[in-house]
């Protein structure tokens, strides 16, 4: 048993500790594209947990600071069988703290969402969002991503449309 634990610790250490040259270090002016999917957790009790899809791109102002544009689609059912659909366009600033294969980050920004609540017509709402996540580099250009973002959209149709998204995805650096 002691041998198995030691072997497992060595394997984990080998995966986590990698040469810094293995992971991509974006330079000023480089770009990346990404896509993600995961649950959307509404802040309002009348909505159920839904799903969130997103795709976008980043432009690096330096090796640790990027501007991000994101297109998103969120769908959640409500009590009574109908649901809410949100489509959004967001602009963010992201700060990365690179650590070998791992690259944790924080981000924040603003956006505009089209909200189509149950029983009402669609309307546009300004929003703010904050969150963070991490990237795990598979090679110099490709990374798996995981993030949690709180999106504060406001009310539409008498209910708040704000939610938290947990997304896993992939990112490719050019």
Model-derived features with residue positions:
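Short secondary-structure boundary/capping segments within folded domains
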Residues: 24-27, 45-48, 57-61
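A cross-domain feature marking catalytic cores of carbohydrate-active enzymes
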Residues: 37, 71, 148
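Outer-membrane beta-barrel domain signature
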Residues: 24, 41-46, 78-83, 117-123, ...
